[in-house]
């Protein structure tokens, strides 16, 4: 349980991976506790990776799949998901992540779109030659940190250093 790592001493790891828990935490206290524990077990100067599911690509996917009306009771008037456990995933916008992180003594190194649009092109990737795929990956790495492009990703990765 990422919210309580009391079986781990403080300041012991050079790298901490929080890859998954934030997808399934629905209240601010739980989110804060998970980040707090990741920061606590990380050494000063260590790196923490925290992954999030993107709100707006999910909204787009619901439109494309003609399913948005099925979830209107879980979406506010600004199309921000009101996530709850029975829906499985908590969805975030960058401002949500920034709000969660605001109270921690950390320095953001990178905020990236982890998969960008690859979720939409599963079959196309299977059909690519190695040369095409390598070129796509070069493109992916060129755009994955661009602030105007991160919103295209289904998953975001916040990489920060403990001060």
Predicted regions: what is each one?
Residues 14-29:
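A short SAM/SAH-binding and catalytic strip from SAM-dependent methyltransferases
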Residues 87-105, 109-111:
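Short alpha-helix
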Residues 32-47:
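A short glycine-rich, Lys/Arg-flanked "PGG" loop and its adjoining helix->strand segment in the class I
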Residues 69-89:
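C-terminal alpha-helical "lid/dimerization" subdomain adjacent to the S-adenosyl-L-methionine
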Residues 3-16:
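A short acidic, Gly/Pro-enriched loop at the edge of an enzyme's catalytic core
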Residues 4, 23-24, 55:
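Active-site micro-motifs of SAM-dependent methyltransferase domains
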Residues 110-163:
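A C-terminal cap/extension of S-adenosyl-L-methionine-dependent methyltransferases
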Residues 47-75:
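Conserved class I S-adenosyl-L-methionine
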């Amino acid at each position: 349980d990422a919210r309580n790592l009391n079986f781990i001493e403080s300041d012991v790891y050079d790298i901490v991976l929080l890859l998954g828990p934030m997808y399934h935490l629905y209240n601010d206290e739980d989110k804060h506790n998970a980040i707090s524990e990741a920061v606590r077990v990380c050494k000063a100067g260590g790196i923490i990776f925290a992954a999030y599911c993107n709100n707006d690509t999910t909204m787009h996917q619901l439109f494309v799949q003609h399913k948005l009306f099925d979830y209107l009771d879980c979406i506010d008037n600004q199309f921000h998901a009101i996530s709850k456990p029975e829906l499985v995933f908590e969805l975030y916008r960058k401002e949500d992540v920034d709000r969660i992180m605001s109270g921690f003594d950390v320095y953001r190194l990178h905020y990236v779109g982890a998969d960008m649009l690859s979720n939409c092109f599963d079959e196309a990737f299977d059909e690519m030659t190695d040369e095409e795929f390598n070129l796509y990956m070069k493109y992916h790495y060129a755009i994955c940190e661009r602030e105007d492009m991160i919103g295209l990703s289904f998953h975001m990765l916040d990489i920060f250093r403990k001060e």
